Design a protein with these regions (language model features):
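His/Asp/Glu-enriched, well-ordered alpha-helical/loop segment
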Residues: 239-246, 288-372, 386-391
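Metal-coordinating catalytic core of metallo-dependent amide/deamination hydrolases
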Residues: 138-253
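Histidine/acidic-residue-rich catalytic or RNA/ligand-binding cores of hydrolases
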Residues: 219-231, 259-264, 281-290, 307-324, ...
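Active-site microenvironment of metallo-dependent hydrolases
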Residues: 2-32, 36-38, 42, 47, ...
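Active-site gating loops and adjacent loop-to-helix segments of metal-dependent hydrolytic enzymes
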Residues: 79-111, 118, 145-156, 219-244, ...
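Divalent metal-coordination and catalytic microenvironments
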Residues: 25, 39, 61, 72, ...
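Alpha-helical scaffold segments that flank or form the walls of functional sites
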Residues: 81-147, 167-176, 421-429
Length: 430
């Protein structure tokens, strides 16, 4: 049976939550039952008996694995998939992306964010970090679809309308205390001046908000920052107080050894965005140097205008292959490490004690159909998930103890796609 979002609220997450019992799933090669109560895994053992009112899922023949966390993206850019491909980053931004975005309304952001969430859920993602416009509309989409999100208050020094909306979000911060939260998202050092960055530091500390920013994505960004401030972007952000525990630094491509040390010492997270970096020819994430210094790493897709899809399967594969090819080392970036970036390390970077299917952890998980041809044979499920899997293998998605996809069906998906097409027709005439 497929439940609506309002039904989920009645079934899961309330005081008398009857919970979910997953029967017959394979975990670490063993057939087990998994009980979920009030958003957490509460019991894992063979042959558990259903409790009164419990929602029972038949998972025979399926594997249960942790769900994915997408630590960098611009969700409503799903409306620009294929709109502007095969061009240099700053031409892409100045001549295509920013003019398109200038026409977007809150309803477009809502429609585009729902389309993005639909794609993410159908490929196993239960949390996304967003950095885009109209935060209330993006948050509304995430709340309605039952997915975790941290909605970034996108900040630029020269955009008074966006900054006014951000102030309104801060005034209503109590609306963002559940699984949909807000973060501060200054765009980059080339769009946010010193005064605004210092305000971001002060305000984020006052409200206890995470920071999410692009960092050292291109050689031009680094050269311009050195020319203006005498420091690399990383060093400049460190000087201003942006680098701190769990600040999300998206891209981190052009880093000196000193930059990497600063990131490691601060506890910030380097968010690896391999497919976008490759497509925009921005450069290669310095995987070996970052890992050698113990920097925390998570993975992200970026937006659909630069990476075109939102599947973490592709991101995992891209991260592994890129590191191996660039370093000419088949042993670097093993499947288990890459999988951890997308699950456990991603969860921690998102502020969620999840990423494992273990008692006491947040109940964010996937039921994987291991009969899909790309997963046969199954010598190593983790290797298959990183190197050969596709979104079609994800049968069921559970986020915060709620079923948000079952049998590859998501509530209202036809209407979500239709509304996104309406926005595209108005914005691009296509």
């Amino acid at each position: 049976m497929l439940f609506s979002i309002s039904d989920y609220g009645k079934i899961i997450g309330m005081k008398n939550d009857p919970g979910i019992l997953i029967k017959g799933a394979v975990r670490f090669g063993e057939v087990v039952d998994v009980r979920i109560k009030e958003g957490f895994f509460s019991e894992i053992a063979p042959n558990l008996s259903p409790l009164p009112g419990e929602n029972v899922l038949d998972a025979r023949g399926m594997a249960i694995v942790p769900a994915f966390y997408n630590l960098h993206g611009h969700a409503a850019m799903s409306l620009m998939r294929g709109y502007a491909d095969d061009m240099e980053l700053f031409k892409w931004l100045n001549e295509y992306v920013w003019p398109f975005e200038a026409k977007m309304t809150g309803e477009d952001i809502y429609n585009g964010t729902r389309l993005a969430i639909l794609e993410m859920v159908k490929s196993g993602t239960v949390h996304f970090e967003d950095m885009y416009w109209f935060p209330f509309d993006a948050a509304r989409a995430a709340k309605e679809m039952g997915i975790r999100a941290r909605i970034g208050l996108l900040t630029l020094s020269n955009n008074s309308n966006a900054n006014k909306l951000n102030r309104e979000c801060l005034e209503r911060i109590d609306e963002f205390r559940g699984i949909v939260k807000i973060a501060y998202s200054p765009h980059a050092v080339y769009t946010v001046n010193e005064k605004t960055l210092r305000e971001v530091v002060e305000t984020s500390e006052r409200f206890g908000l995470n920071i999410h920013i692009h960092c050292s994505e291109t050689e031009k960004e680094v050269a311009d920052c050195i020319g203006e401030h005498g420091l690399t972007p990383t060093a400049w952000l460190g000087k201003l107080g942006i680098l701190r525990e769990n600040t999300l630094l998206a891209h981190c491509v052009h880093l000196t050894d000193e930059d990497i040390d600063l990131i490691a010492e601060s506890g910030s997270v380097a968010v690896h965005v391999p497919l976008s970096n490759l497509k925009l020819a921005s450069g290669v994430f310095p995987y070996a140097r970052i890992k050698a210094r113990g920097v925390k790493v998570a993975l992200g897709t970026d937006g659909c205008c630069s990476s075109n899809d939102l599947s973490m399967f592709g991101v995992m594969r891209g991260a592994a292959y890129l590191a191996k090819g660039f370093h000419n080392d088949t042993t670097i970036a093993p499947a288990s490490e890459i999988f951890s970036f997308a699950t456990r390390q991603g969860a921690l970077a998102a502020g969620v004690d999840g990423g494992f299917v273990e008692v006491g952890k947040a109940a964010d998980c996937l039921l994987i159909n291991t009969d899909i041809p790309c997963l046969v044979p199954n010598y190593s499920l983790v290797s298959n998930l990183v190197y050969s899997a596709s979104p079609e293998c994800v049968d069921t998605v559970i986020c915060d103890g709620r079923i948000i996809m079952k049998g590859r069906k998501v509530e209202g998906e036809e209407e979500i796609v239709a509304k996104a097409r309406e926005s595209v027709k108005r914005l691009a005439g296509r």
